[in-house]
């Protein structure tokens, strides 16, 4: 039977992704492309980005010596100066960082990790570690892990004491205690900051001050940058990762490196046009004012409209809630258009809301004034056609 030939139609040539209005409860969500730049920030970096994208560049050639150089060298110097770390490595996301560390340094060896740090959210850290070729030795329970649990787990196959950032543990073992234990037994102490509390830049600096063997985190969320995983730590450990064949599979290209440089530069200078910082530093009063503005635009429409307290969250970061407000709507004529149909029609127009108890809810946390106007126009159009 002959295979059907797929024709190249105009629809296939349309831009595959389009901008959306994120009125959902999830900020920097995987489904929405995670972090994004502010317009002001993009306008600042656009000339340099254009230069990198439209010309050959010195990615791996040293213009001073005419020899080959490491593509990470310029960024390495900036990271070292900024965070006082011995060495860094950049891979395509933090999951890659975790996998590379486990595969390169603990192949067929044991990683000792608290059971409670492997659960929560949508991201299955346990599967990543098991598929790396390392073995897991779980200690503690869902919300408690004591130092004695780690000590009792030690054996001749132990290689890494692994800790994942989890501020909601009821009984947490301080990382510095794990470091002491690791040094006593010549093990690697590894701290996975992952999607750390993004409103608190001190978290990274506090862990770095402890000088862990290895540390990794998500650059796109921490620096509001392109998706990347940053590995920092002891030169010996990072060099072992860099020389591993898997690193070449996971390394990043010139666009990611350029965007990461620009984002880190802005982060160092505390620039206010970093989207993450602007959103996460919103006051409760500012969020209420946003809700009132959207309420005023929607009230004249054929809708029941109200404001309610709510919570947003950062992507799939478990347990981190952001106080906010939502504007709840319900069509007055539910026979012609119920809330489920309205939710779907909004979704099809690129307005991502949520539905709860027969109401469509617009979370205001990620919205701006242009979004309010667009939501009102889309709703008016939908109601007129109902």
From Swiss-Prot:
UniProt keyword terms in alphabetical order: Cytoplasm, Protein biosynthesis, Pyridoxal phosphate, Selenium, Transferase
Alphabetized Pfam families for the sequence: SelA
Any one GO cellular component localisation term in the record: cytoplasm
Enzyme class: transferase
Role description: Converts seryl-tRNA(Sec) to selenocysteinyl-tRNA(Sec) required for selenoprotein biosynthesis.
Similarity comment: family membership: Belongs to the SelA family.
Name by which UniProt lists this protein: L-seryl-tRNA(Sec) selenium transferase
Organism of this sequence: Helicobacter pylori (strain ATCC 700392 / 26695) (Campylobacter pylori)
Lineage, broadest ranks: Bacteria, Pseudomonadati, Campylobacterota, Epsilonproteobacteria, Campylobacterales
């Amino acid at each position: 039977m002959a295979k059907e030939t797929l024709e190249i139609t105009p629809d296939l040539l349309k831009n595959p992704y389009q901008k959306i209005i994120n009125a959902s409860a999830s900020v920097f969500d995987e489904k929405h492309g995670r972090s994004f730049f502010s317009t002001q920030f993009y306008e600042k970096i656009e000339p340099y980005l254009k230069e990198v994208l439209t010309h050959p560049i010195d990615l791996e050639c040293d213009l001073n010596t005419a020899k080959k150089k490491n593509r990470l060298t310029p960024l390495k110097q900036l990271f070292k100066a900024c965070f006082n770390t011995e060495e860094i490595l950049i891979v395509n996301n933090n999951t890659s960082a975790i996998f590379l560390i486990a595969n390169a340094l603990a192949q067929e060896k044991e990683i000792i990790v608290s059971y409670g740090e492997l659960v929560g959210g949508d991201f299955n850290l346990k599967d990543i570690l098991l598929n790396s070729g390392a073995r897991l030795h779980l200690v503690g329970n869902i919300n408690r892990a004591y130092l004695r649990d780690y000590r009792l787990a030690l054996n001749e196959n132990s290689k890494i004491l692994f800790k994942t950032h989890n501020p909601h543990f009821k009984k947490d073992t301080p990382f510095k205690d794990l470091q002491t234990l690791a040094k006593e037994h010549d093990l690697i102490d590894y701290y996975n900051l992952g999607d750390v509390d993004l409103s608190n830049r001190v978290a990274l600096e506090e862990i770095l001050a402890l000088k862990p063997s290895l540390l990794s985190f998500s650059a796109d969320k921490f620096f509001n940058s392109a998706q990347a995983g940053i590995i920092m730590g002891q030169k010996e450990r990072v060099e072992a990762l860099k020389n591993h064949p898997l690193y070449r599979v996971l390394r990043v290209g010139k666009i990611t490196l350029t965007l990461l440089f620009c984002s880190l530069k802005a982060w160092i200078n505390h620039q206010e046009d970093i989207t993450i910082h602007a959103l996460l530093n919103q006051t409760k009063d500012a969020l209420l004012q946003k809700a009132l503005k959207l309420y005023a635009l929607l009230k004249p429409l054929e809708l029941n409209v109200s404001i309610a307290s709510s919570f947003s969250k950062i992507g799939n970061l478990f347990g981190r809630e952001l106080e906010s407000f939502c504007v709840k709507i319900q069509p007055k004529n539910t026979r012609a258009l119920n809330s489920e149909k309205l939710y779907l029609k909004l979704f099809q127009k690129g307005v991502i809301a949520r539905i709860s108890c027969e109401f469509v809810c617009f979370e205001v946390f990620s919205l701006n004034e242009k979004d309010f106007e667009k939501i009102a126009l889309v709703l008016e159009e939908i109601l007129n056609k109902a």
